[in-house]
Amino acid sequence: MAHRPTVLSAFMSTPSPALSDFDARLHRFRQHLADTLVPLWQGPGWNADMALPYEALDAEHRPLPVVRYRAMACARQLYLFSSRLEQPGAAERAATLFRSLRTHFHDAEHGGWFHSIDAHGQPLDRRKDLYTHAFIVFACAHYWGQVGERLVASTLEGALSVVAERFARDDGLYEASLGEDWSDLGSGPLQNPQMHLAEAFLQTLAVRADEAVQRALTGLCEALQRDFVDPDTGVMLERPRGAADNWFEPGHQFEWFFLLDTSPLLRDTPLHASIARGFAHAEHVGVQDGAVLAMLGVDGQVIDATQRIWAQAEYVRALALRPAWRETLARQLQVLETRFLTAEGWHECRDGAGRVSRHDMPSTTPYHLATCLAGLQE
């Protein structure tokens, strides 16, 4: 496949020469999100009949054949548009996404939200998973902080109650997946849903005081330190410590570092100290020639050398937290721009040799780019 022009090729207005190279790249990143990426989901990426975003677009901006719509994808897009309510059409789109989250995915019989619906709007995967519910809490908390509407507040409250009453275990952790009727599927806890639940709790605390959420968050972090952190390296493992064939993902180390380091509540906790060590280890063994690798074994051996745009964005966001990392940050922002962003959108993945290995653009990715940009601007 012919190499598509990157953002550097032009297709965007050029910032003032007075800006530093870093500021110029940041300007282009901000402009690319606003002028190219967000409009994809206002135009070709939007199914007006379903009032939902398509799951993904191809490189020519055509929707992929519809197999499903996920509640998590709807919630991520709600965050995206509620983050830019001042932009034309964003407030209306956020309101529509919020309505769709409630009408398409909510389980009126058992409570909670289905994982996905089919092309006709009928429940597809009827299980209740923590990852989905964490993003519903996150998106509703953020949206409520923007609009202050009573229905948004009640939806947030309902989602928090479901998490506390259905997913919570007696060890401070949360089940990854439950049946439609909340039956036990034996999933146990997994790292990624716990991380996004922590993110959702932090977003809730950013918009309101909530002692129950604060207790749940600190308890979750204590349990993760106990059961998921590798004591030798400080990295957060994907499965509980001692699980067979365990691994870690450098992108998640960088994502965790940002969440903990930016929280006055969680900064300087034992988990923060571990993840700071884990960051250094992940950077040493999991970043090669500027590319964040997908998966490594506990021993540091590469399992999957795929380079994913979300992991690159999380690395950039984390690097912005330390003035001493400014030079590395500038290099990594360049990597994000030149290897992943294109005039038409973005490359989702490259393989270990640097070749584009995934040619579609999922509706869930702009969430990572928007949170990365927000972190850089803050």
Q: Which role does the model predict for each range below?
A:
Residues R4-E378:
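Glycan-recognition and catalytic cores of secretory/periplasmic carbohydrate-active enzymes
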